[in-house]
Amino acid sequence: MAAPVASLNPALAGIDSLFSAFPSSSSLPLGVAYSGGADSTALLLAAAERWPGQVQAFHIHHGLQAAADDFVRVCESVCAKAGLPLHIVQVDARHASGESPEDAARRARYAALATAATARGMQGVLLGQHADDQVETMLLALSRGAGLPGLSAMPASFGRGGMVFYRPLLHIPSAVLREWLVEQPIEFVDDPTNTDERYTRNRIRARLLPALAQAFPQFHATFARSARHAAQAQAVLVEVAAQDLAVVGNPPAIKALQALSPPRQANVLRHWLLLQYATPSAAQLEQLLHQVAACTTRGHRIHLKVASGHVTRLGGSLCYSDAAARAC
């Protein structure tokens, strides 16, 4: 990694912390997901300062807002002044009936970033999510009754579509990044949808975060610590599930499942279903546990809806099949 460069940009601290374990030869060149907002602007300029000539900006144009073209103009202006390559990637983020618009846009964005960055030889993509985003994600998970995966919030790095994504700003509050940009001054845009309180995340941002800051000034650090604890505990559960799956078999043998405690049954069944690209709801998993417990005779049948498919009984084992050509 390059030697530290003197700079007041707080995003550099996050970059240095995340990338201290990576030799530059394995992580460069890098793309930055650049929306034109304050957070990604600070991240882009910090990355360009840390690795001159090794950073390119990627702007995803969803076409979902009237202001989208204004975002592009700001991105072009900032990148031109900084001498950075900018790639505008058009995506179709329309959502299907019954699908969350936010989820559809997020999936389209990551897929487009992975494809565009790979095509230009990037070894990774930096994302601008910060400490406030991490707290919002945890509070959203709590509001939905999430388990450890949800409470783990956002990981610092992950793979998708053959590309590695990094989040170096997860320990830096948004206000710190914004203050630095204003002091320079450096141009950025505010997404008007971020103040639309029809969205739960925006209500959390507008109402809960200010209250938390007043009552618990260190909440960014304490929430981040809780997320790390949850992630560590989840990692242990995944290890135990893999060990149990090796014992009960894949597909799982019903008698072997019944020999496990109910919590371990739930853990290994969730793990098995995730391997089939099926995410069971809490209610579906509870129903499946009841059915496994009731399998005391050969004639007991199981046919439960899980995600887009069904769990059935096939002889002495469970089987998952769905419309995506996975069949028992």
Curated annotation (Swiss-Prot):
Keywords: ATP-binding, Cytoplasm, Ligase, Nucleotide-binding, tRNA processing. GO terms for biological process: tRNA modification. Its EC number is 6.3.4.19. The keyword Phosphoprotein does not apply. It catalyses: cytidine(34) in tRNA(Ile2) + L-lysine + ATP = lysidine(34) in tRNA(Ile2) + AMP + diphosphate + H(+). It comes from Polaromonas naphthalenivorans (strain CJ2). This is tRNA(Ile)-lysidine synthase. The N-terminal region contains the highly conserved SGGXDS motif, predicted to be a P-loop motif involved in ATP binding. It holds the Pfam family ATP_bind_3. Its main location: cytoplasm. ATP binds at S35, G36, G37, A38, D39, S40.
